């Protein structure tokens, strides 16, 4: 692939860089220039199921095969066929009693422009907070955390297996946690988010909730995507949710708040502008003159602005003014209408004709178009591909498959709004009735006034949008043309949305859709160099508090996931619950600090050497001295920073 505007031939540039060791966390030598020139570069692929903890994976595996397991890797999913298995800690930092704050004052909203909090001195002690039992069925924070309410004032959340459990399946249920010596409230304390965990996976740096590609002081941390660029490798990001969400965003931006999705040109303090601007660094930037090009070779995912607000009777192929949440109108219009825009991407998008016709033959097949385009483009010629998709009414996400694959949730809002505890008006230990969205944004004026049925809506949205597996295949097809190798991240982001909404139907469907993409990748590896040439890691960014009872397989088989979601309102009849209260179906609606599964394979991946090892943390005070600390590891587990190190080594092998 061409390296931006340098004019330097790729292999010469890559060979030069391979002589220089520039990263702090380097633990193995660079690959030799001759190996790269011979096309022997390793392909490193990480696939992240957002929120895909051990229990969510078990739910999907059980739904798919009917088999039940109570410990270990399990079976039934493609990811569980990978030979390597461990689990990872996911914790981040905490300042002043909050996990979402930096060590800066926040007086200037621009990333890194605020001064350090007066008197702040980093303390490497663990500080998860003090667990407090809450029986109420809410997703309120269950812990008093931070320096204001604990004695040590530490700035690392940490993970203590003596409190949370030595692995993701111990304790198997909060109902037995106390009897086994664990605290069922502990994993609620100071839980991480997708931004800081992705930052750790891509940079090796632990940071605060909201951070994308920056450290505790909002300083830039080089991402593995940037490193791959320097090595002359192609790069890709694929997601089932908006392309400017935290998991893809942390690989392609240095931003202090994950909600900075996009900005109008030439402002650069946003995820999308940093990701796709090619004319960087920009000496005329009003805010971020420090940003260099990220420019992923392939960027595919959701966030299309068509009808974000779930409004009814949408009758135009053009997005409404309220729809531009994940991408600005100026950016969208440049990509769509201006071939000489400042971004340099071949641009594909979902078909908007769905609001004009019910004739399925007139709807562009988004998956087929994407695969055909990817086959034509060549990163060695400087080609780049950006595909923007998302179903109407779903906050920019791809169509939701549901557990039985009927896509009956497509077009319905599904993120911590309707069936979660916070919206169910539950009383302590009382029966909770979910309130799911039932109104799709149907185009009521089309087809001579007959409008659009739910079945027509679903069929058209499915055709207009590729699946995650198709996007993964397209990315692999295009990136594989770079014989120097590539780095690729694929995210099943909507798994997290289903769990936030306490919706077992969507959890299972989204996980299986993600696993289909994993199978696509495994099959591709077998035909393209095998495990000598390719490395695959499948993991989660963080966990959620979901528990499956022993009755779950029987109840799922008898009733189906849709019934367990919408008509069975107690743990006894639904076979599962959310949170630390076994008698409440909806006792929580957010993440936990529990360890997450890691499935992996590839001869160039030496992740096993990090199992049980300490965790490096560098306190890099702006303009001052950097101090390196070693934090305690967990027996039989790795940390997400170790996954970064192992990927980096494989990338340079």
Per-segment meaning from a language model:
Residues 17-25, 29:
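Hydrophobic core
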Residues 207-210, 214-218:
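His/Cys-centered metal/cofactor-coordination and adjacent catalytic loops
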Residues 1-9:
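N-terminal secretory signal peptides that target proteins for export/translocation
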Residues 41-44, 49-192, 197-199, 240, ...:
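A post-motif C-terminal structural segment
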Residues 35-39:
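Boundary at the C-terminal end of the N-terminal hydrophobic targeting segment
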Residues 229:
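Anion (oxyanion) recognition and catalysis
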């Amino acid at each position: 692939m061409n390296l931006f505007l340098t004019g330097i031939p790729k292999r010469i540039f890559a060979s030069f860089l391979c002589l220089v060791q520039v990263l702090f966390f380097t633990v193995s030598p660079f690959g030799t220039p001759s190996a790269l020139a011979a096309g022997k570069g390793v392909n490193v692929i990480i696939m992240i199921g957002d929120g895909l903890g051990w229990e969510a994976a078990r739910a999907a595996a059980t739904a798919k095969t009917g088999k039940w397991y109570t410990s270990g890797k399990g079976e039934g999913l493609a990811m569980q066929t990978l030979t390597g298995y461990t689990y990872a800690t996911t914790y981040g930092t905490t300042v002043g009693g909050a996990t979402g704050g930096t060590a800066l004052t926040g007086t200037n909203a621009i990333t890194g422009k605020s001064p350090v909090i007066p008197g702040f001195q980093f303390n490497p002690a663990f500080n998860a907070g003090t667990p407090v039992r809450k029986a109420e069925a809410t997703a309120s924070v269950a812990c008093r955390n931070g320096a204001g309410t604990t004695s040590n004032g530490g700035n690392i959340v940490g993970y203590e297996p003596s409190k949370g459990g030595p692995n993701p399946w111990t304790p198997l249920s909060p109902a037995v946690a106390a009897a086994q010596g664990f605290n069922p409230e502990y994993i609620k304390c100071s839980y991480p988010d997708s931004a800081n965990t992705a930052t750790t996976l891509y940079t090796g740096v632990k940071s605060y909730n909201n951070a994308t590609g920056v450290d505790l002081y909002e300083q830039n941390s080089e991402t593995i995507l940037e490193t791959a660029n320097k090595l002359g490798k192609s790069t890709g990001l694929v997601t089932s949710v908006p392309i400017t969400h935290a998991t893809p965003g942390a690989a392609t931006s240095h931003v202090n708040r994950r909600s900075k999705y996009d900005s109008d040109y030439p402002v650069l303090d946003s995820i999308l502008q940093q990701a796709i601007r090619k004319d960087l660094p920009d000496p005329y930037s009003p805010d971020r003159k420090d940003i260099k090009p990220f420019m992923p070779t392939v960027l595919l995912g959701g966030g299309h602005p068509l009808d974000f607000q779930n409004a009814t009777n949408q009758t135009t192929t053009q997005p409404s003014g309220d729809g531009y949440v994940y991408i600005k109108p100026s950016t969208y219009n440049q990509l769509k209408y201006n071939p000489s825009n400042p971004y340099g991407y071949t641009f594909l998008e979902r078909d908007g004709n769905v609001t004009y016709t019910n004739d399925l033959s007139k709807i562009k097949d988004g998956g087929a178009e994407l695969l055909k385009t990817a086959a034509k483009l060549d990163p060695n010629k400087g080609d780049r591909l950006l595909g923007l998709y998302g179903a109407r009414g779903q906050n920019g996400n791809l169509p939701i498959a549901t557990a039985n694959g009927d896509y009956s949730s497509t077009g319905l809002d599904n993120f911590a709004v309707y069936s979660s505890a916070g919206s169910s008006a539950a009383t302590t230990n009382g029966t909770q009735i979910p309130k799911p969205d039932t109104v799709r944004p149907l185009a009521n004026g089309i087809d001579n006034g007959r409008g659009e049925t739910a079945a027509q809506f679903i069929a058209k949205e499915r055709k207009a949008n590729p699946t995650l597996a198709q996007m993964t295949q397209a990315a692999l097809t295009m990136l594989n043309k770079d014989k120097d190798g590539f780095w690729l991240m694929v995210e099943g982001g909507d798994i997290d949305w289903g769990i936030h909404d306490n919706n077992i139907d969507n959890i299972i469907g989204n996980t299986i859709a993600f696993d289909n993409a994993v199978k696509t990748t495994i099959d591709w590896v077998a035909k393209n160099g095998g495990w000598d040439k390719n490395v695959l890691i499948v993991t989660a960014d963080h966990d959620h508090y979901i528990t499956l009872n022993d009755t779950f397989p029987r109840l799922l088989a008898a009733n189906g996931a849709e019934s367990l979601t919408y008509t069975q309102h107690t743990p006894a009849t639904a076979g599962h619950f959310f949170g630390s209260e076994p008698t409440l179906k909806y006792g929580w609606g957010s993440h936990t600090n529990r360890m997450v599964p890691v499935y992996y394979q590839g001869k160039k991946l030496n992740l096993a050497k990090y199992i049980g090892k300490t965790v490096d943390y560098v306190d890099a005070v702006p303009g001052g001295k950097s101090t390196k600390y070693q934090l305690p590891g967990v027996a039989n587990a790795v940390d997400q920073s170790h996954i970064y190190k192992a990927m980096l080594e494989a990338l340079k092998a």
